[in-house]
């Protein structure tokens, strides 16, 4: 239900002039939290980053890295890695941590896969991550768009690795199958949080269905990946249990990060997880047998994605040869 902002919600204006949702008004009663000293980055503008920055500006290209203000842009661009958002800037679902707005999406842009592929080519990327909004308004849930973007990138950039971060397509096997057939190097679907708080944080998704998406991708023969965001009300024991669930579901690669609140209308930060806790979670995940693990306050699901894929592929290959 939409409601008008209350006085405490000042500064939490909703996008595109819409009224704040009741949940957003409640969230806005909590001021934006002060970040702890370990949540900081230093700009290291090496030659690769500077070249890409100038090229992106000159060619009018669009990346999530810049438009979302990602703190890791300097490192990723130095490695010739970047992330692209497809499907528009309006999502048909609302997650309480996500900065992408919920609304009625624009009509499907069938030329978008070609433009993304050309951007990858122009930027000379070694590894490209493609993510997008949920498109429940489309008959196929956007499956063609996700699959075609992978196909277009691979056709124009045969040596570039592609990681595809997808919604759950409501668990529909035909839509998931169409996406899997495009065979990205990594198929990612982010669980994001633990079962107890899942419904509150991601009401349009279900925890088990997200696990099932990863299982289906793994059974198809794809390298799988997921992400957990900490600081939204979970306990350390629940994090460990979720890691077990993800590994049992067939997830190869896991990233673990700190929740950073995008605006006052988003879910308040309930806890700042200390760096040493991330080290402990990473060690626990490695002990479970994940092929690739990256955890830290400023890690994002696409952070060092190419390196993590190579690490996972190496471990999977090594494990297969040792078991033989």
Curated annotation (Swiss-Prot):
PROSITE patterns reported for this sequence: RADICAL_SAM
SMART domains: Elp3
Catalytic activity: [[Fe-S] cluster scaffold protein carrying a second [4Fe-4S](2+) cluster] + N(6)-octanoyl-L-lysyl-[protein] + 2 oxidized [2Fe-2S]-[ferredoxin] + 2 S-adenosyl-L-methionine + 4 H(+) = [[Fe-S] cluster scaffold protein] + N(6)-[(R)-dihydrolipoyl]-L-lysyl-[protein] + 4 Fe(3+) + 2 hydrogen sulfide + 2 5'-deoxyadenosine + 2 L-methionine + 2 reduced [2Fe-2S]-[ferredoxin]
Record pathway: Protein modification; protein lipoylation via endogenous pathway; protein N(6)-(lipoyl)lysine from octanoyl-[acyl-carrier-protein]: step 2/2
A GO cellular-component term linked to this record: cytoplasm
Enzyme Commission number(s) of this protein: 2.8.1.8
InterPro entries: Aldolase_TIM (IPR013785), Elp3/MiaA/NifB-like_rSAM (IPR006638), LIAS_N (IPR031691), Lipoyl_synth (IPR003698), rSAM (IPR007197)
Designated name of the protein: Lipoyl synthase
Organism of origin: Mycobacterium marinum (strain ATCC BAA-535 / M)
Organism phylogeny: Bacteria, Bacillati, Actinomycetota, Actinomycetes, Mycobacteriales
Designated gene of the protein: lipA
């Amino acid at each position: 239900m939409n409601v008008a902002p209350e006085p405490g919600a000042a500064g939490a204006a909703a996008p595109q002039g819409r009224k704040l949702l009741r949940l957003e008004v409640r969230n806005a009663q909590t001021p934006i939290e002060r970040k702890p000293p370990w949540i900081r980055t230093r700009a290291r503008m090496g030659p690769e980053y500077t070249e890409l920055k100038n090229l992106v500006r000159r060619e009018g290209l669009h990346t999530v890295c810049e438009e979302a203000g990602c703190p890791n842009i300097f490192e990723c661009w130095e490695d010739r890695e970047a992330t692209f958002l497809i499907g528009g800037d309006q999502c048909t679902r609302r997650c309480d941590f996500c900065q992408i707005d919920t609304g009625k999406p624009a009509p499907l842009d069938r030329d978008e896969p070609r433009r993304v592929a050309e951007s990858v080519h122009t930027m000379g990327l070694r590894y490209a991550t493609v993510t997008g909004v949920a498109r429940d308004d489309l008959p196929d849930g956007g499956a063609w768009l996700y699959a075609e973007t992978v196909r277009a990138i691979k056709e124009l950039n045969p040596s570039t690795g592609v990681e595809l971060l997808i919604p759950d397509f409501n668990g529909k096997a035909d839509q998931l199958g169409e996406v899997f057939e495009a065979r990205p190097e990594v198929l990612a679907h982010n669980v994001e949080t633990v079962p107890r708080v899942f419904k509150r944080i991601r009401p349009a998704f279900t925890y088990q269905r997200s696990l099932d998406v990863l299982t289906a991708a793994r059974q198809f023969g794809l390298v799988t990946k997921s992400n957990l965001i900490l600081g939204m009300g979970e306990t350390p024991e629940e994090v460990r249990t979720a890691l077990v669930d993800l590994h049992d579901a067939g997830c190869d690669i896991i990233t673990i990060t700190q929740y950073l609140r995008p605006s006052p209308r988003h879910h308040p930060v309930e806890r700042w997880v200390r760096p040493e806790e991330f080290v402990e979670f990473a060690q626990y995940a490695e002990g479970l047998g994940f092929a690739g693990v990256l955890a830290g306050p400023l890690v994002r699901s696409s952070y060092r994605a190419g390196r993590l894929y190579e690490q996972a592929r190496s471990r999977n290959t090594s494990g297969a040869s040792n078991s033989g």
